Curated annotation (Swiss-Prot):
Comment block on domains: The SMP-LTD domain is a barrel-like domain that can bind various types of glycerophospholipids in its interior and mediate their transfer between two adjacent bilayers.
InterPro entries, sorted: Mmm1 (IPR027537), MMM1_dom (IPR019411), SMP_LBD (IPR031468)
Membrane topology (Lumenal): 1-25
Subunit structure: Homodimer. Component of the ER-mitochondria encounter structure (ERMES) or MDM complex, composed of MMM1, MDM10, MDM12 and MDM34. A MMM1 homodimer associates with one molecule of MDM12 on each side in a pairwise head-to-tail manner, and the SMP-LTD domains of MMM1 and MDM12 generate a continuous hydrophobic tunnel for phospholipid trafficking.
Disulfide bond is among the record's keywords: no
Record carries keyword RNA-binding: no
Chain segments annotated as transmembrane: 26-46
Membrane topology: Single-pass type I membrane protein
Family: Belongs to the MMM1 family.
Species for this entry: Ajellomyces dermatitidis (strain ER-3 / ATCC MYA-2586) (Blastomyces dermatitidis)
Protein name in the entry: Maintenance of mitochondrial morphology protein 1
GO-annotated biological processes: mitochondrial genome maintenance; mitochondrion-endoplasmic reticulum membrane tethering; phospholipid transport; protein insertion into mitochondrial outer membrane
Function summary: Component of the ERMES/MDM complex, which serves as a molecular tether to connect the endoplasmic reticulum (ER) and mitochondria. Components of this complex are involved in the control of mitochondrial shape and protein biogenesis, and function in nonvesicular lipid trafficking between the ER and mitochondria. The MDM12-MMM1 subcomplex functions in the major beta-barrel assembly pathway that is responsible for biogenesis of all outer membrane beta-barrel proteins, and acts in a late step after the SAM complex.
Amino acid sequence: MAGPSNQTQPPPPVLTQPSLSFTQGLLVGQLSVVLLIGAFIKFFIFGEAPPHPSRNGLSNRTSSHRRSYSLNSISADSSPRTLREKPSTSNILRPVPSSSTNTRSILRKTYYSATPTNPTSKHSRSRPHHSSHQPESLDWFNVLIAQTIAQYRQTAYILKDSPTSSILASLSEALNNPEKKPSFIDSIKVTDISLGEEFPIFSNCRVIAVEDPNSDGGRLQALMDVDLSDDNLSLAVETSLLLNYPKPFSAVLPVALAVSVVRFSGTLCISFVPGPGTSDQTMSPSPSPPKEASAENIAVDHQSPERQSARQRAPHQHKYTNTNTAGATAAATADDNDTHAKLPHGIPKTSLAFSFLPDYRLDLSVRSLIGSRSRLQDVPKVAQLVEARVQAWFEERVVEPRVQVVGLPNIWPRMGRTGVRGSQEETEAGAGGSAPADIPGTAGGDGVGVRGGGGGGGVGGSGGGSMRGTSGWGMGYDGLRYRHNAHGDGGVGAGPGQSAGAALYGGAQGGGGGGGRGGEEQFAIPGSMPDPVVVT
């Protein structure tokens, strides 16, 4: 029996060495993760870059890959222009096809349905149609118009003491034009002006398409109802009728008139028409009498020196505050006038044409006072003559088929009329609607009193009229009503519920406040005239 030493033991197993070390495997794993993340970012997050077009590839594009422009598309017969071709000076601006500017295209692109339901009338005259689109409210437009009118009233009140730019001077010069006034009428003196307190209300706006032989595809016209009532828009004048036979100034008959607008309502028509360039009249000239000198034109002529000085200061003033807003406005207006004057002859200029339909309503109140010793008050025949003359004046200017054409200003941004809102305006805007300090009659205890009450030292109105203080501006600002006094002691306000005719005969009742004048004294006609005799 063999011993344990003679037994052979099997050799130990040989351990195989790994081909890669631990460090190398870690690096390979990290690298694979980085590659996977990079591939994910490249193919799933970033898109494929578009191929760079070659220079010769621009002219070889097919029509399916070419972007079509609705307003600037080139006609089919014209060949495309490559970047290497230099455009000539005559075709830099791409033409606009007429199919993109006609009324049908405009209505389609603005999603407005204005298909007329009634056919047009004959004899080549357009007749207003009813639109299938629902009438729109004009509340936002009423606010803008009210702000504009309020600014005009404030400007007229601020310039009331100006010898040339005031509305009183403009009206006096227009009424006393020697070319228009007959020889038997003495100089006309404006005794009372009221610019009103209320604002016109526009409503029921609708856009219609009308036929126009001067426009391709017709033109669009906006119709809106306007109503102005319960206002004190009035004008009072004094003059004398002269009897020049058998010798000049043989007899003199004093006459006092006061015309007030009780109510106005009608349908306003607004449209844009291309002007003939140098002339403002785009329509056929009407056989109306020669154009009379209006108060607005005279006011513009008087303001020409101020506009020239403002235009000289405009290039050096690029910022403004609330104190020089009027100067910036005058500079902008002068800049627009210069731009229109530089336009070559024959270039059409877009204009705004507006008129009223013949079914308007204009109610007037005419008060008259005729005579010296024995005065006749409110003669019906005089009221009829004055009302007929005012109606004829209105119809000759703004009632269809006659229209008023106004050239649109240049709205291109210019540095001469660029301004920055002042810190004072921003502070007032954030103060919750507090009244600004520069508006007369809104600050202080001696300003305009509420209706039924009165400020200190005010003048008594009639009934529910407003009691206006005289310590501040000398008259109430809310009505913008002032009286041209021959003694030069300033104007006196009148209540909003009081007609202009009461200013002629002392119709205001009620006593004034402390320091104010009585109703009979402030509204009496200058001169020694006895009490009026009422005609029955």
